[in-house]
Curated annotation (Swiss-Prot):
Autoubiquitinated through 'Lys-48' and 'Lys-63' of ubiquitin. 'Lys-63' polyubiquitination is mediated by UBE2N. 'Lys-29'-type polyubiquitination is also observed, but it doesn't require its own functional RING-type zinc finger. Keywords: Cell cycle, Cell division, Chromatin regulator, Chromosome, Cytoplasm, DNA damage, DNA repair, Metal-binding, Mitosis, Nucleus, Phosphoprotein, Telomere, Transferase, Ubl conjugation, Ubl conjugation pathway, Zinc, Zinc-finger. The lineage of its organism: Eukaryota, Metazoa, Chordata, Craniata, Vertebrata. It comes from Bos taurus. InterPro entries: FHA_dom, RNF8, SMAD_FHA_dom_sf, Znf_C3HC4_RING-type, Znf_RING, Znf_RING/FYVE/PHD, Znf_RING_CS. It is found in: Nucleus; Cytoplasm; Midbody; Chromosome, Telomere. Pathway: Protein modification; protein ubiquitination. SUPFAM superfamilies: RING/U-box, SMAD/FHA domain. The modification Phosphoserine is found at S157. Residues 143-176, 182-201 are annotated as: Disordered. This is E3 ubiquitin-protein ligase RNF8. It is an enzyme of class 2 (transferase). SMART domains: FHA, RING. Residues 68-72 are annotated as: Required for interaction with PIWIL1.
Amino acid sequence: MGDPGSLVTEGRAGERSWCLRRVGMNTEWLLLEDGNEVTVGRGFGVTYQLVSKICPLMISRNHCILKQNAEGQWTIKDNKSLNGVWLNRERLEPLKVYSIHKGDHIQLGVPLENKENAEYEYEVTEEDWERIYPCLSPKSDQMMEKNKGLRTKRKFSLDELEGSGAEGPSNLKSKISKLSCEPGQQVKSHGKGKVASQPSEYLDPKLTSFEPSVKTTGAHVNPGPAKVIELLRKKKKASNPSASQSSLELFKVTMSRILMLKTQMQEKQVAVLNVKKQTKKGSSKKIVKMEQELQDLQSQLCAEQAQQQARVEQLEKTIQEEQQHLEGLEKEEGEEDLKQQLAQALQEYRSLVEELNRSKKNFEAIIQAKDKELEQTKEEKEKVQAQKEEVLSHMNDVLENELQCIICSEYFVEAVTLNCAHSFCSYCINEWMKRKVECPICRKDIKSKTRSLVLDNCISKMVDNLNSEVKERRIVLIRERKGKRLF
């Protein structure tokens, strides 16, 4: 049968998948499977379990959640983590969903005081499955399933130890790794080399998950997350720091003991490998004894790690309580600031209202002046209109009395003046002279007729200022008389 990994690769050959690529590493990539929610943290039950080798409290139990939205876009949410989630160097608000895209930079936790970058930094990418698969980090459930049968400690029999002598040091390394109290990681097989030069290569990687945060003397603790240190400092100023101080002291002591046990176990493993390398059968009892001592050391280390984990959880709980207390203090200070800001805003509001009232009075005075001016203008306009109407009325009287033909009772049309100085319409006097050759007014003989253009022009301009009815009637009259003249 072929390698199961190759079968998985062939089954998804040609596909492209989304993943979080660990910055600067070709391992521990996090696969984002379509349709599945991905959880990341240091606790159990998450999709990918991250155990910080520098600071155990850096990653929260359920640090963040990645899943697809209705449109298939991948999103990330900070699940109220202690040290936060950072997207493109900006911290995300807790419990708020943010979309992520190819090339985005994701950071879990914060850098330590003596580091420029955080321990867990990723880049969102989409790659071919053949490229991603060799670099993927195993899921938590896969690791638990793979190591179900390795939970029980086993002892080597004499025959196994004798047989292992012929197999060489590499086989012994894998057997020693099975003695771990929590064999959650696979031990890589290294070639032959100097055992003393690389003793940590033969340790169970699970034992190295808690890197010491203290020096070998146990007197100085390496800086933890900036947020934790700052919280503890604020707590010292605000209240009694006994709880956090005792937790930190226990943390220091336990880490020192874990470091000492790990050092002893490394030395014991190196000694077993050296003895096994030097002899094949002669020192079997000595090897069994040394491996029994190694088991005892590993058991002690397991117990210390369990205690340390409990203390870490207690310390985290204490820090959270202190953080809540500090938030309460900050809230009270914020309320005082808010009251001051409110009083200042109220004062500004009153000043603004007074200014608006003054402006309102000024505008009312301006409006009253404009209204008065408008009334005056309106009165003057009415006076002018009345005068105009009076002039038009007087002009109508003049037209009716002085510029009307007594024959047709219409305004003169082509006025002519007789030798007696009386004026008539040209058409009317011509018709009159067909019956009598004397003036209709004074009865003098008509000897001459003179056309009066000035009188015609004066009548035409005066008629233009009259109403449309008078204008239309005059136009019709002129047309009728021109038509009669043609006939």
